[in-house]
Amino acid sequence: MKKVTIRDIMKKYKNGEKIVMVTAYDYPFAKLVDEAGVDMILVGDSLGMVVLGYPSTNQVTMKDMLHHVAAVARANPKAMIVGDMPFGSYEVSEEEAVRNAVELVRAGAEAVKLEGGKEVADKVEAIVKAGIPVMGHLGLTPQKRHALGGYRLRGKTEEEARELLEDAKALEEAGVFSIVLEFVKAEVAKKITEEVGVPTICIGAGPWCSGQVLVIHDILGLAPFSPPFAKKYFDCGKAIVEAVKKFAEEVRSGEFPGEGYYW
């Protein structure tokens, strides 16, 4: 098994091949998405809402992230593991940002992701200097949704578009190996992709990026609420309910466990 590395990601980028990233938060899902052939597995702080039942990503702690990164790492995937740095884990100081990034790597992450542009460039640079690859995240940055006026499309105005491009260039200069663009106007994401020299991984930001990412629970129809840009490929939630209903019916009728299911 040849492990996917940053060299492989950059090779795909330079060859014009689309890069695929999907979230996973535990051992079995990491095994499955890796078998599907994704390039990167993102252990995202989105786990707070889709797995832990938190109202937002802001409640996710380093303890939560370390637990789930370690679970994914135990699956020993070929895909590169990217661990999210949760809210409050990198904003205070460069030293704290590096310390928490190191903890995620010790848990099994092979790169870390953090939200923000120019204002976090110093933290990005410090983490990169510590030898840890960093993925940036611009556009709809859920950890900062209150400051941005909620969950809304970014890049609709000329000023926002200019700021996003400036932020992307600042992140590139700080040393990121890629940048997630979330819920950004497609034309703006296209311009950013054309003007930076690192891959852009988009979610709800159009088809002109270097790659795409989706939350596994959105792909499978497991999330109670999915954003408008998330395509559902299978209604797994409905299938699970039907399967458990069938089990319950068979238990109550005495049909289960039938012959062959006991000794």
From Swiss-Prot:
Name of the protein described by the UniProt record: 3-methyl-2-oxobutanoate hydroxymethyltransferase
EC number assigned by the record: 2.1.2.11
Cofactor: Mg(2+)
Pathway named in the protein's UniProt entry: Cofactor biosynthesis; coenzyme A biosynthesis
Compartment annotation: Cytoplasm
Assembly description: Homodecamer; pentamer of dimers.
Binding positions for Mg(2+) per the UniProt entry: D45, D84, E115
InterPro entries recorded: Pantoate_hydroxy_MeTrfase, Pyrv/PenolPyrv_kinase-like_dom, Pyrv_kinase-like_dom_sf
